[in-house]
Amino acid sequence: MDVPTHQAVPQYPALLDATRRIAQDVAAQHASDVDTQARFPIETIQALRQAGVLSAPVARELGGAGCNLLELGQLCAALAQGCGSSAMVLAMHYIQVACIARHGLESSFFRDYLRELVARQYLLASITSEVGTFGDTRASICALERGDGRFVLNKDATTGSYCAHADAIAVTCRRDAHAAGGDQLLVLVRRQDCTLTQTTSWDTLGMRGTCSPGFRLESAGSEAQILPHGFADIAAQTMVPYSHTLWSALWWGIAADAVNRAAHYVRGEARKHPGTVPPTAMPLAELSAQLQAVRHHWQAVAQAFDAIGASTQDGGATQDLHGVGWALRWNSLKISCSEAAPQIVHGALQIVGMLGYKNDSPFSLGRHYRDTLSASLMVSNRRIAAQSASMLLVLKDMP
């Protein structure tokens, strides 16, 4: 993809200001068309590129902003208030960049790639799903083939979010043909290294702009593109924490925009009858409290993660992230926020009424409702709850 070279990447405060402007001036303006046409939010992603937002997780010494998990969550939450699909693309991109930034620094290839990502503002996608694993991202069927410093990797993915629009794709696979399904590696496949053949469609209820059909991936490249750490460590220390936190942040952002629309409606009702409190003001206050609770939840978990200094260089911290306590914390965050977001949007709809139900109304909440319904399905809450149930059987003290 031909993208402009970005010379100077702003730091977090400037990135947050830019993201808020993009959410309002670009993402929100195109959100309805992105949703209706189930098309990639190209205008928003291009605006994020121009503002240097895509390299936010990259360390400052490599030219990035060095944003921590809480700061990345704030960026995703801000964008989600304009367009949920755009925010999901940004969140998934950040997850993959973080995997490289936190687990690839001992490799000269990945250090150079991160510098290039900062300069070119590359967009990264991932393929962690696979036909035959039934949604278990911690198991792979496909295996890496190596020889003469090169690799070959082919994979049948059930979903590949915005892969057709990405500059590179992070792909999970078995270490080799003799490895167990859970003995996985993560490989960075650049767009020029692969061919993608779409195998399914993407005509969904919500999150339509993520463009996530199934793909057949055929790729080859240098062994240097294989992350040096096993995927089990990458998942526990980075992919799971970043996924559940950034997703929760953007679900909050979608719900926040729904509450803002409800608040605008209630203020309009109040102006019609000066000196009186409209009956919709009370449920709005209750809804605001629910929204605040969700925000406090994801921000508190992000702050706790950042506070332990969980870098791949800190053995004690990384061991903590492999423990039952942190696993339960991530599971609780994901389930709680994914269930609360659509409930909050539903509450906003009850306040606004038919104007929220109509698609051509400035108070329309249909897209918000449909987008948040995806939250409990992307990594099924039932699967996560079953994992938590098993862990609670052996946990002596609640985290």
Question: Can you annotate each of these PLM segments?
Answer:
Residues 202-292:
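Glycine-rich beta->alpha junctions and the first turn(s) of the following alpha-helix
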Residues 31-35, 293-336, 349-359:
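C-terminal helix-coil-helix/basic helical segment that borders enzyme active sites and/or dimer interfaces
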Residues 156-196:
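A short core secondary-structure module
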